[in-house]
Amino acid sequence: AGGQGSLPLAGTAVYMTSYSRLNEQRGWEKGMPERKWLYQTPIDILIKASNGASDFGNKFGQPLITGSVLTFEHNENNRRLGYDKVIMQAGGIGYGKAEQSIKHKPSEGDKIVILGGENYRIGMGGAAVSSADTGAFSSGIELNAIQRSNPEMQKRAANAIRGMVESDVNQIVSIHDHGAGGHLNCLSELVEETGGLIDLDKLPVGDPTLSAKEIIGNESQERMGLVIGKDNLDLLQKIADRERSPMYAVGDVTSNHRFTFESKTTGEKPMDFALEDMFGSSPKTIMADKTIDRQYAEIDYSTQNIPTYLKQVLQLEAVACKDWLTNKVDRCVGGKVAKQQCAGPLQLPLNNVGVMALDYNGKEGVATSIGHAPIAALIDPAAGSRVAIGESLSNIIWAPIKNNLKGISLSANWMWACKNEGEDARLYEAVKACSDFAIALGINIPTGKDSLSMKQKYP
């Protein structure tokens, strides 16, 4: 949903959990006692999260072509480390036309439109809850913040956008996806330079018990917000009808630099803010911490036991064959997959890079790879950043990248247990090292995500 619209190509996925505890014979998994898991066991997460990612990709027509999995726990010096708060990172690659990559400024009278599904009590407070330690809120609040997916609806909306993007002239002025904060976040960012008036009664409601706050702020998935000229509304409606995508004209662009939700039937205004109050200069966040020099015990091993160690290492989910992740799904859905996880006559998941063609005839494409080094980062956060970048680059070199390093962009994703003593300082070291290393290589980092609350609390 960048600029005036873009086209998704393929998905990626990373799963990180604590040890799966598949059986009693895995001695390394007994270093920490098994916890009373709050919602799902690690093995359930590994199975069900991957099922969901694969199923979504198949239904949407966006193949899952690369990924990674890691399980880890460590107990030393009264510090318990592990992915009890699990990571399921869903990413992806796509492309857009250069001339459509910049959002245009809306004009007064332009129409504010929503493509996609209706509002439900889903994803309430998702941004706040995802930024809090798991267990900090009641289970009801945490479960209420969980998003749900609807690939069929997303495909319909995406196809409507594709129809505009692939036209000779794309009439979309600006487009934005719905994420945390729902309509409040998405629609306000569309009109942050001008102002907008949203008719609360025109917002599609699937649950009649929703309050105004829930209608405005829910994170029901598979919706896009966009601005389009009034004269071009019929064109978008025809394309949406062809793709069977629900479409709603919910408001107008104004020039009063206010963002307002108003019910035309009751006259109520549950929200009416000046844009400067929403997008003005926010106070800088100051993170105060101290550096703690953590030392870890030297590895205690015997050369006589190397065959045993090897057998154990080969059983780790991060090392063992990943066919349980790949062989349950069509990895070539859509017909543009040039390289996915599996290779050879046995289709073993050994490829380091995923590649998608841009069309069915040409030889232009997009490559993607993944790198991470959380264990190295425990010992040295700066080294961990460099190793993660190095791993991603050593994985992607198997694709003939146009313009070499200048043709590569990074997405930096930080999952960190901030506010624990010493962790903010370690994060600073890691981010600075990542920035310095990328600059030295001449690689840009245009995007990324942070989850700075990777801490699990138990009752």
Predicted regions and their residues:
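Glycine/proline-enriched, intrinsically flexible loops and inter-domain linkers
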Residues: 1-459
